[in-house]
Amino acid sequence: RIKDKKYLAYVKRNGSGCLVCGRKEVDAHHLRHAQHRGWGLKNGDQWAVPLCREHHTDCHRTGKEARWWAMHGIDAIAWAEMNYMVYGEYTSQEENEEDE
């Protein structure tokens, strides 16, 4: 399980806004259906996606997260995978610039 507070901050500020409505004020929602996890544990931070408070709460209320995302026509797992890859490239570039 990846824990990365810097990545969670990146998810909140990267400019895409809520994946459902586009609002800029977002929480980092951990996708529960992205990987197998132990009871009561969050998935790794690499599975965090931006959701406004309203949609974050609504997603948790449904209990059927995969269905909730499908209802909104969003492939949140693909988004999380791509965003985490972009973040990795971004942080690698920052580290290289610091070394120069």
Each predicted region: which residue ranges?
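Residues immediately within or flanking Cys/His clusters that coordinate Zn2+
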Residues: G15, Q46-V49
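Short, solvent-exposed loop/turn segments at secondary-structure junctions
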Residues: A34-H36
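Polybasic, low-complexity binding patches
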Residues: G38-W47, T57-E100
